[in-house]
Amino acid sequence: GEILLRLSPPDNERIVRGETFQKQVGGAELNLASGVSLLGLRSGIISRIPDSSIGMFAKNKIRFCGVSDDYLVYDTGKDARLGVYYYENGAYPRKPGVVYDRQHSSMTRIDIDEFDDSIYESTRCFHTSGITLALSEECRKTGVEMIKRFKEKGALISFDVNFRLNLWSGEEARKCIEGILPYVDIFFCSEDTARLTFGKEGNVKEIMESFAAEYPISVIASTQRTVLSPKIHNFTSVIYDAKAKKFYEEKPYENIEVVDRIGSGDAYCSGVLYGLLREDGGCASALRYGNASSAAKNTIPGDMPSLDREEIENIIHDHETVGYHSEMNR
């Protein structure tokens, strides 16, 4: 997936008025790989970045998060660039805002021949998202072919629709994604996206069942976020085990104090994948780790999560326990 440079005015300052920006790194697939690494699994990011000081900044952040940089390729061209986006926080009644500057980034010119065939070996799970497929024709071709090659070598395929209207239309997304769904094992799609992109009808459970009936997907996950204000959210999700034909749900995390919601969906995916891939994993575990990881990420500035497995398990314990909770970890 694409690695992005994020620039944000501090606190609640506005892009149109602020004079300084905080520099951070993110991107859907990197956010997920970072979350999985924090929870205890080995992860790496496949991407293309500029061979420059900005690219080195991104590489250093990747390493700091415990994510392998062995699968990066470097763009040495004069027009090499890292995609950029600007983000400002919201406060009721003003919504958060995003401005993208990612066209013609190094990632948009990715080519599958830049990667050695050894990357397809010994991988338990390959994850990508609709954002990556929407970036360019080169990204789409490379992403689809990698899905097929990883699947052929025995990896589970995880896919997050992550629909972005500013990147492609619902019809473009539907045509492309329906072509890869026969290869997908773990599918992340919100109820709203299922209706907008795939024309699905019915409630969320009926929508999930319809995907499982049409494609050989094993696990389908759908987040459910209630935005009370830019700073206060409720969050939970539904996971469907298509083989057992069983739904998994839990009570929502309520009144989450949102510091930064960017990346919370990716944190959810990382928790779900950890819950499925851990030694005693399954959908029940995926639900607990996914919901807790997403809820917790909302409280962390920047795109990437910053809580390890012990901290997430403490959050899960408090969420499931009635009665006294310590107000501080000490």
Task: Give the positions of each predicted feature.
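Positively charged, low-complexity intrinsically disordered leader regions
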Residues: G1-R14
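Histidine-anchored nucleotide/phosphate-binding helix
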Residues: A28-L38, T142-R149
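Conserved N-terminal subdomain of the carbohydrate kinase-like
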Residues: R42-G130, I312-R330
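A short helix->loop->beta-strand "cap" motif at the edges of active sites that frequently abuts
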Residues: F150-L156, Y215-S218
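Conserved phosphate/ATP/ADP-binding segment of small-molecule kinases
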Residues: L167-A244
